[in-house]
A protein has these predicted regions:
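Hydrophobic alpha-helical membrane-insertion segments
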Residues: 39-50, 125-137, 205-221
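Long, hydrophobic alpha-helical segments
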Residues: 47, 76-99
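C-terminal coupling/interaction segments
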Residues: 1-10
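Transmembrane helix boundary and interhelical loop/hinge segments in multi-pass membrane proteins
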Residues: 90-110, 124
Length: 279
């Protein structure tokens, strides 16, 4: 008995979906290999680890005073942290599409039997994965410090301030907001790379936009409170990070950053589509 048209339609849909994700995975692996398979990616990782260690050392000196806040709060409230945090994203994303243009491989990619969405998402998820990998060492530094202090207090008969479970839970908020804000900043960097034919210009453009977004949250510090101040408080990445680092988990940053990420990726798709049509 031959299969019904309905079953054939379902099978075709399944096959197309499977083929779509196989192609997306291929692009993702290719791009991720471009980060981990070349010295440039490891240089970024090494520099990030060194800066994280430097900031942790400064934070531990600050914490010799009773502040009532944890290690992660002070690390994210450090100006040096924001300096290198902003500059990480241009380094990660400036090569995604601008480098393809320079090497002459973008022509082949845009004329290949792949959709623009697959290209954008494959590059985005690879860059975002690499960004998340950069924070794994940062998880170990303060965690080892806290656990070491905990067992030292227990050994010398001092009542610990919190359990190890509490310490581990103390990292959930900070890493959540770093993942959320990073999702948007990576998307913004890829958009700048799509708009430029030069890595340097893409890096400068994305850096300027991220610095502008950073200072949006500082408007109330410069001008004080005014009727529109709640909007700037809502957009302030510094206030969000400090709130999450203090253990205050708010749903509004989830909505904000996920919406901005989707919008930026959609805009990137339109830019790549335009470059595809004009070839």
């Amino acid at each position: 008995m031959p299969p019904s048209p309905h079953m054939e339609s379902e099978n075709n849909t399944i096959m197309r979906t499977k083929s779509y994700f196989i192609t997306l995975r291929t692009i993702y692996r290719r791009e991720l290999k471009g980060y981990l398979g070349v010295p440039f990616g490891w240089v970024i990782l090494a520099c990030t680890m060194a800066l994280q260690g430097f900031i942790l050392q400064a934070v531990l000196q600050i914490m010799t005073q009773a502040t009532g806040n944890g290690v992660m709060y002070h690390m994210l409230d450090n100006l040096n942290f924001w300096f290198y945090f902003i500059f990480i994203f241009p380094l990660i994303t400036m090569r995604t599409l601008a480098e393809e243009e320079r090497q002459g491989t973008l022509e082949g990619l845009l004329t290949a039997p792949v959709t623009t969405t697959q290209i954008v998402l494959g590059k985005y998820f690879a860059a975002y994965t690499f960004y998340l990998l950069l924070w794994l060492p940062m998880l170990l530094y303060p965690l080892v410090s806290d656990i070491g202090n905990y067992y030292t207090e227990v050994r010398y008969g001092i009542q610990p301030e919190g359990s190890i479970t509490y310490m581990l839970a103390d990292w959930v908020g900070p890493y959540t907001i770093l993942a959320l804000s990073g999702a948007f900043f990576v998307a913004l960097g890829i958009l700048c790379s799509a708009m430029s034919r030069s890595q340097i210009i893409a890096a400068i453009l994305s850096t300027c936009l991220m610095i502008m977004y950073y200072f949006i949250g500082r408007v109330t510090e410069l001008w004080g409170e005014f009727p529109a101040a709640p909007i700037f408080h809502y957009l302030s990445c510094t206030e969000q990070v400090k709130a999450f680092a203090s253990g205050v988990v708010d749903t509004r940053p989830f909505v904000l950053y996920l919406s901005l990420t989707v919008f930026t990726l959609a805009l990137t798709k339109r830019v790549v589509d335009y470059r595809r049509w004009t070839r």
